[in-house]
Amino acid sequence: MTGRILLLNGPNLNMLGLREPEIYGHATLDDVVELVRARAEHHGLEVDAVQSNHEGDLIDALHRARGTHLGCVLNPGGLTHTSVSLLDAVKASELPTVEVHISNPHARESFRHHSYISPVAAAVIAGAGVDGYGFAVDILANNHLQRTASQ
């Protein structure tokens, strides 16, 4: 299989390994990108990784990926709970998107329980630590194989 996936990480995820390690663990963003690239390579896929603390940058990355990528692994960070614009960009991209959260938002403060992204996500992985990113790649690869086999 060949193709590209977009790895998109939102606000504060550049601080992984430093910010609240008791919640998010000690893995860094570089560790996450390496994990995703290794898992994607196993499936014959390439990865374009983007992290931004700015909502518009994430939206632009989704727009650019439309028609060129087979899916998106998205950890929207705090934008999960606030961003209708990011929701609209996920929809406009027409990419199968797996929403990933390192911690389980439902086991945390009540304001974290709502996700604007989940209703349009192909899958949601929460509470699996950084391993959730690898699971997301597996889901996108398997879904792509199923779609191409049925065409």
Swiss-Prot record:
Keywords: Amino-acid biosynthesis, Aromatic amino acid biosynthesis, Lyase. One of its GO terms (biological process) is chorismate biosynthetic process. The record marks R19 as: Transition state stabilizer. It catalyses: 3-dehydroquinate = 3-dehydroshikimate + H2O. It comes from the Bacteria. PROSITE patterns: DEHYDROQUINASE_II. Pathway: Metabolic intermediate biosynthesis; chorismate biosynthesis; chorismate from D-erythrose 4-phosphate and phosphoenolpyruvate: step 3/7. The active site is at Y24, H101. The keyword ATP-binding does not apply. HAMAP family: AroQ. Homododecamer. This is 3-dehydroquinate dehydratase 1. The lineage of its organism: Bacteria, Bacillati, Actinomycetota, Actinomycetes, Mycobacteriales. The gene is aroQ1.
